[in-house]
């Protein structure tokens, strides 16, 4: 079976390394490549994928929303998130999914077992935030709180959440067990500070969905304060495992995938 990840740029993607490690571990001769598709060529997506004879593919920035009009069916989770990161090609039909939310939550559950009783604050109200919030809302008992700079961003949400400003989030920071940053602040090349951690409780788990850099500025600051931190590496691995399950109906080897990514990040 042939798979790929599409994006622009795409040379930095660790998806091929991760998926190939999984294939090797499971004794599969499947292939996985990275395809750079510029925005101006995206209208040729059906032709490009058809020529590659793919059975499924992942989508990353900047095409997660752009792919939707080309799909025959979109899964509920992807509709809720407003973005697609996984496509299954079956009987000539393109089916879109979003595994980012479930990927993040599965990873978070492994480090925070009592997740269903946690008071959670999500920073940012974009597609990543929405996907994670919808997944958490399925079983977390306390109402989720989502903070954003502008309240207008919540107009596309139909989830029962507490909607607050970032200024209010700073004030009430001590009330949360878990704080999750879903904004680009702290990504490689972006040193913007999203929130002041002055009122962060020492017992709060500080999380970021980014894994490059391995510790974003907000995670470094929380760690200096003595808090436990959790980055986006597991989200990346688990979303990949969920994609593999959608394509093949098989369980992925999580350990081999994570090891391959860690080795790559360490430059081994």
UniProtKB/Swiss-Prot annotation:
Has UniProt tagged this entry with the keyword Amino-acid biosynthesis? yes
Its catalytic activity? Answer: shikimate + NADP(+) = 3-dehydroshikimate + NADPH + H(+)
Question: Binding residues for shikimate, per the UniProt record?
Answer: 13-15, 60, 85, 100, 211
What is the enzyme's class at the highest EC level? oxidoreductase
One GO cellular-component annotation of the UniProt record comes to:
cytosol
Q: Where is the active site?
A: 64 (proton acceptor)
Output the Gene3D superfamilies linked to this UniProt entry.
Answer: Leucine Dehydrogenase, chain A, domain 1 (3.40.50.10860), NAD(P)-binding Rossmann-like Domain (3.40.50.720)
Query: What are the BP-aspect GO terms?
Result: amino acid biosynthetic process; aromatic amino acid family biosynthetic process; chorismate biosynthetic process; shikimate metabolic process
Superkingdom, taxonomy of origin: Bacteria
Q: Which UniProt keywords apply?
A: Amino-acid biosynthesis, Aromatic amino acid biosynthesis, NADP, Oxidoreductase
* Assembly notes: Homodimer.
NCBIfam families, per this entry? aroE
The family annotation for this protein states: Belongs to the shikimate dehydrogenase family.
Q: What does this protein do?
A: Involved in the biosynthesis of the chorismate, which leads to the biosynthesis of aromatic amino acids. Catalyzes the reversible NADPH linked reduction of 3-dehydroshikimate (DHSA) to yield shikimate (SA).
**UniProt-listed PANTHER family:** BIFUNCTIONAL 3-DEHYDROQUINATE DEHYDRATASE_SHIKIMATE DEHYDROGENASE, CHLOROPLASTIC, SHIKIMATE DEHYDROGENASE
Give the protein name, as stated in the record.
Answer: Shikimate dehydrogenase (NADP(+))
Organism name: Staphylococcus aureus (strain NCTC 8325 / PS 47)
